[in-house]
Amino acid sequence: MLLEAVLLQLLVLATRASPVIFEDCGSAYDLFIVNIAGCGAAVPCYVTLGEQIPVNVMFYADFVSRQLDQDVTININYIHARTPVTPEPCETVMCPVQSDAITSFTSVMSVPTDMALNQRGYLQWRVYNEAGRQVLCYSVLVQTQNYLQKMMRQYVSEAHRKQLHRLGFYGL
């Protein structure tokens, strides 16, 4: 039952999100794809204060890890805000992580509400194994927004898409 729910969540995430531009910051595993719900290849990735945002990663593991722990921060104006994420990877992925296999997992990030608004910074996501080895590390350029700004961006984006469609630019 849990596996079916996770697979359904992955399917929804895969159809609604496109990979974001990320910088690998020292992953031991080969990180292929980072999907953040609501973000695509456009920079920055807008994150809404107080929202729960699904984040999916896909990577190739060339060695076994029995346990994975996440350390996630949003760094804005030299302030490093710890960002709660759930669940831990081994709650959704069969651990140990298999060697010579492509693995994917989804966690949900809670964006803190006490951060500066309309500021750019970096989301940094680190994953450590049971030996304390950093197996995944990436950072993504983000900009904070509130719910009203999110709704306005969606409205403008949809209006722009409709205008392009009327002009004969389909599929944009």
What are these regions (language model features)?
Residues 18-54:
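N-terminal edge beta-strand
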Residues 75-85, 131-134:
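Short aromatic-acidic-glycine turn motif
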Residues 84-113:
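A beta-strand/beta-hairpin structural motif
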